[in-house]
Amino acid sequence: MTEKKITVGIIQQQNTGDIADNKKRLKHHIEQCAAKGAQLVVLQELHNSLYFCQTESTDNFDLAESIPGESTEFYSRIAGELHIVLVTSLFERRAAGLYHNTAVVFDTDGSIAGKYRKMHIPDDPAYYEKFYFTPGDLGFTPIKTSIGTLGVLVCWDQWYPEAARLMALQGADMLIYPTAIGWESSDTPQEQKRQQDAWIISQRGHAVANGLPVVAAVSYTHLRAHETCADL
């Protein structure tokens, strides 16, 4: 993307248990980003619902859906109508007993440009993702779109420099991370700052080491919904 400027919209929305309302509000924020000139819009990790991995419950598998499916049709229409590239994050039901945390990228015509299945799966207090997700099998392959080649990864992948490096070596023009990350409610302000600083430093490290812009849409449950645009 030498000498090419792209305006990126990042949406970080506070969700509720009402998936239909969450998607309605996401659509509004996506439209607002497009109205501000965004050519690329990135949503947070697992943006259709609350971050359900804080507990281990078989009921949560009802949130999963096939790809393609209802959500891909919904976001495909939005991307096509607004002529934007849209990065989404879905709970994929691939087959009986096989589920993934999957990023799906839509091109400006609404077509699916590609997808990435999260490779690094955490298993920590309040992040019980191994209960739900099988590690991805698509490798670290950048996704080609009409605005550039996107190195799309998901959340916990951002703590591993190899993932970013492999994307860069294969021609990614930027690194993108739909993310859901925070801290324990019992953490002190000092511990919260330590974790936040470590996360920011890691993202800067990916940018510096690979010479690429890094885009992260972060879901914090205590944040108010907002969208922002920036030029890269």
Question: Where do the language-model regions lie?
Answer:
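Beta-strand-turn-beta hairpins that frame and shape the catalytic cleft
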Residues: 2-8, 142-151
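Short beta-strand scaffold segments in enzyme catalytic cores
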Residues: 102-105, 141, 230
